[in-house]
Amino acid sequence: MIKDGKISNYQFNKHIDEFNELLLRNLRLIPSYSKSGGSDANLDIINNYKKELNSNTKNSKKTYILTRICLSGSYLPNCLLIDFTLSYDDFYMVPVLYFRAFKDNSKSTSGNIDETRVTPIVSTEELVSNYYSVLGLSSDSNLGPTVTLDSHHLITDSSVWFYVHPCETLHRLREFMEADNCLLPCDSEQLQVVKYLSIWYATYSLGGIFPSISLRPTSQP
């Protein structure tokens, strides 16, 4: 069970598959964030997989989920590609988001992507500009928490990633969960961890940075 408002690396690894299923089912754009009501903006999941890194023990094993999404507007010739990972930071004892973004000027009507014509976005100013443009957002819209550039803590390549520093995450998540009383004693550990990750997603993960990209279930008839 979750204690003192935090989960362990072991709990993250154990229940990340359930949260990933929730992510794949419910990741969508919120129409109200678009000038046109969202009809001209689309979100497509291009890729999603889990990677487990070698470790001597089950408790110290490191796992991350990598997802690629494409944000596009039907009236624009380009789209915004976002790769993001969900992983666990041992020092801060919280989940952490890393993401990188690309401008794609060659997305065909069939949805195929020419990787040779994808341009990395390497500044927050360029990221914000492309995000506004693709989704048709007004220039006075704001992104969520401040992001910085860094290398990925688990992926050892030359890529530069955006990320939200996790120094305040534990304190803030504890406050949110206590205020909403969202973790019930009768909940299973799996349900508690999935709830915890959902709150984290909305505040310090992709949904916190890009408020229009939400984990919102499809309305039931």
UniProtKB/Swiss-Prot annotation:
It is a peripheral membrane protein. One of its GO terms (biological process) is autophagy. The keyword Isomerase does not apply. One of its GO terms (molecular function) is ubiquitin-like protein transferase activity. InterPro entries: Atg3/Atg10. The active site is at C167. Keywords: Autophagy, Membrane, Protein transport, Transferase, Transport, Ubl conjugation pathway. Forms homooligomers. Belongs to the ATG10 family. This is Ubiquitin-like-conjugating enzyme ATG10. The lineage of its organism: Eukaryota, Fungi, Dikarya, Ascomycota, Saccharomycotina.
